[in-house]
């Protein structure tokens, strides 16, 4: 199976980030505009976390908070698990499966340069990633 970097090349460029002081509402607007399910959280150029659709569901909606009054810094996932572009896709899929996550930051030399994302359909990530990665083996 190929490397994380191989799959990210197929996916194309692009990551988006917000600051901890951004409201959840503003972050959701950006996610809808860009049709993405997660945002990196950046504090003065330093990667400090990730905000995902699940964070919104579990930490805002189910807690009775409002998206316009809640800041990303209050609910983001701090110190999320990450992978390297040089990691094998098998490792990436295993981490995502074992941790029940769909978005995982890809970190190289301390910098986050991408987010690897699993499709929402159960099992589709393995099939799609294996099909694409086999081209690089």
Where are these regions (language model features)?
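Short hydrophobic/aromatic-rich motifs at helix boundaries and adjacent loops
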Residues: 1, 28-29, 43-45, 63-65, ...
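Tandem CBS (Bateman) regulatory domains
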Residues: 1-13, 52-82, 88-97, 117-137
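A positional/architectural concept
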Residues: 5, 9-39, 43-48
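Short, flexible active-site loop motifs that bind/organize anionic cofactors or intermediates
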Residues: 14-17, 46-47, 62, 82, ...
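Structural motif
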Residues: 15-16, 38-39, 48, 73-74, ...
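The conserved cystathionine-beta-synthase
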Residues: 17-35, 82-100, 107
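A glycine-centered beta-loop-beta connector
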Residues: 31-34, 39-55, 96, 104-120
């Amino acid at each position: 199976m190929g490397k994380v970097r191989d799959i990210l090349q197929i996916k194309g460029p692009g990551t988006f980030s917000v600051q901890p002081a951004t409201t959840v509402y503003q972050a959701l607007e950006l996610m809808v505009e860009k049709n993405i399910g997660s945002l990196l959280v950046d504090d003065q150029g330093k990667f400090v976390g990730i905000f995902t659709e699940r964070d919104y569901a579990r930490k805002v909606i189910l807690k009775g908070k409002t998206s316009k009054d809640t800041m990303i810094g209050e609910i983001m996932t701090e110190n999320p698990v990450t992978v390297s572009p040089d990691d094998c896709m098998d490792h990436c899929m295993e981490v995502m499966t074992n941790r029940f996550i769909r978005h995982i930051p890809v970190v190289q030399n301390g910098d986050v340069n991408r987010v690897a994302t699993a499709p929402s359909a159960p099992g589709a990530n393995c099939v799609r990633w294996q099909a694409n990665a086999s081209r690089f083996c």
